Amino acid sequence: MCGIVGYLGKKHDAYPILIKGLKRLEYRGYDSAGVALINEDGDLSVYKTKGKVADLEEFCTDKDITGHIGIAHTRWATHGEPSSVNAHPHYSQSKNLAIIHNGIIENYAEIKHNLMEKGIEFQSETDTEVLVQLIDYIQTKKNLSLLMAVQVALHQVIGAYAIALLDKRHPDTIIAARKQSPLVVGIGDGEFFLGSDASPIIEYTDKVVYLDDGNIAVMKLGEELKVVNILNEELSPEVQTVDMNLGQIEKGGYPHFMLKEIFEQPACLTNCMRGRINVEHDRVTLSALIDHRSKLLNAKRIIIVACGTSWHAGLIGKQMIETFCRIPVEVEYASEFRYRNPVVGESDVVIAISQSGETADTLAAVELAKSRGAFIYGICNAIGSSIPRATDTGTYIHVGPEIGVASTKAFTGQVTVLTMFALALADAKGTVSHDEYTKTVKELAQIPAMIKDLLKVNDQIADMARTFTYARNFLYLGRGFSYPVALEGALKLKEISYIHAEGYPAAEMKHGPIALIDSDMPVVAIATHNGMYEKVRSNIQEIKARQGRVIAIVTKGDTTISQIADAVIELPDTMDCLEPLVATIPLQLLAYHIAICKGKDVDQPRNLAKSVTVE
C-alpha cells in the first residue's frame, strides 16, 4: 500500500535519493507524501503534504533539506483521512523520533488511550503516531536504547507493520522492522538504502536483504548491517543480488506505464516461457513439478487462493487444470478463505497467486493452509517476496516490474504459468492425449507472436473508445474460458476509468442483467469461434433487440456478428483454452483509451494501491 524509502551514508545527500525513491514507488498508490531528515547540526525536520510527490517537492523548495540520513513515505489512508497532518513521517511528542509505517496496528485505540492517560498528546488520527509515541514513552520511561525500546513496543503491538525510525540523538542510525509487510535493505559501499521493494534501491546497489517477519534491522554508519529479532537474538541476513535494472522501471517512451506494460506482453510471455517450453520437442518442463512430482501427482484437490486480477487468472487456471488434469479445483478469494474455517488438509495442493508476493490476505491464506498440512504452490512475479518464501515450491511469472496499478502483463503471465502447470501435470498424470498435449504446447508457444500482431488494433480501439466515453455503465459477457476474461475486462474499466462495469456469464444475462440493457449501456461480448459461438450470437441479438450497443470481440474473418454489432475487434484464431491470453488484450486497451479520453490518471487511479499489504 504505502511506500517506504530510507537512506544513510556520506556519499550523497539524502533528500534527492528519497524523492527519487518515492517516485519509483508511486505505482503502489498513495494520497500524501512526506520526508524526515537529520541535518549536520543534528536537527530532525519533518515535511509532509497531501497530494503527490511533486507537491511535496514544491512544499520543500524553501525548507532545509540538507543531511545524509533520512526516511520518506507515501501514504494510502487506512486510519484518518488523507491530509498533511495524517501523512507520514510522524514525530514523537518529544520530537526526538520520527517514524514511517506501512500496515495496520489493530490495537492502536487501546494503546492510544493508555498513552493519553499518561499525558501524551496526539496530533493526528493515525495508528502510526501511536506507535512512535509508544516507542518514545518506553525509551524515556525505562531509559532504554532505541533498539530495545522498539523491541518492547513491538511486543505490545497487534497487527502488521513495516517501519523505519530516526532518532535525532543518533544521527548515524536507522532502525527498521517488519511483520507481514515487505521491507528491503540495500547495502552499498559505506551506505544503506531502504525500500518497500527493490525499485528505489536498484539505481545504487544490487545487493539487498529481504527482511523476514519479526526481523529488526539496525543500519549504522560505518558498521555492518545488524539484524535481530524481537527477543534481541542476532540473525544472519542473507544478502541477495537483485536481477533488475533501471530501464525496466522507466516508461521507455510510452505516455503511461500501463500502455508500456500492455505492449510489453509479447516479450514478457516469451520470457515467462523461456526454459520451460521446449519448442523443438513440444514439451513443457517446470522444475517445481520435477522436484515435487509425487506430492502434485497425488493431490486429491487443488485450491487456488488469490485476490483481484489474480483471482480472475485463477478462474482460468481452474478450467485449464480440470480440463487437462481431471482434478477438482476450487477458486477462493483469499480474503474469504482465511476467515471461514475452510476444509483443507494434507491431500490438497493450494496454489497462491499474487503479482507482488505481498498481498496480505493471500499470505494469510497460505499460512492457514500450511497449518492444516496442505502443500503450497506459489505463482508470483516479485522475486524474493513473502509468498515465495512461505510456499513449498512454485513458479515465477518473470514478466518484470509492473508499475501501473491496474495489472496487465502480470495477468497474462499468471495465465501462462497456470497453462504450463496444467499441461505439465496432465502429461505426468497421463490424463491428456499426446496429440492434444503437443498441439496445445505448439499453440501456446505462438501466443506472443499472436499478441504482437493483435496490438496493431491499438489505434482502432483508441478511436472506438471516444464513442463510448459517455457511458456510466458497461456489461461484459463471456462463456467458458471467456467468462473470466469478461470479469477481468470489467475490472480494468472500473479501476482506471471509474465507470461502473460488471462481468457476467453470457447465459446468465437473461437472469437479471438484461433488465438494465438500453441504448445507454454498452455491452462487450466475447463471441469467438468456440463451442459457445451460436449461443453468444443469440445473446447479442437479444441485446440489439433492446437497443443495446454491442462491442463484439470476434475471431478474425467473422462476417456474421460484424453485421449486427456496433463495433468489432478481431482476434487471431486459437484454441479455446488459450483464448484468454489474446482476448484480454483488446479489453486492456479499451479500458486504457476510455480512461485517457476521460482524462483519468491510468497509472495511479484513485483509492487503489498496487500492492495491497493490509487487510
Predicted regions and their residues:
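Conserved short alpha-helical segments that host acidic/polar catalytic motifs at enzyme active sites
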Residues: 1-251, 255, 267-301, 339, ...
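Generic C-terminus detector
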Residues: 258, 549, 562-564, 574-615
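Glycine-rich oxoanion-binding loops at beta->alpha junctions
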Residues: 72-85, 280-293, 317-353, 359, ...
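Active-site phosphate/pyrophosphate-binding segments
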Residues: 265-303, 393-522, 595-615
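Structural beta-sheet core signal
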Residues: 4, 99, 165, 176, ...
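Glycine-rich phosphate-binding loops that contact phosphosugars or nucleotide phosphates
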Residues: 297-439, 443-446, 526-567, 590, ...
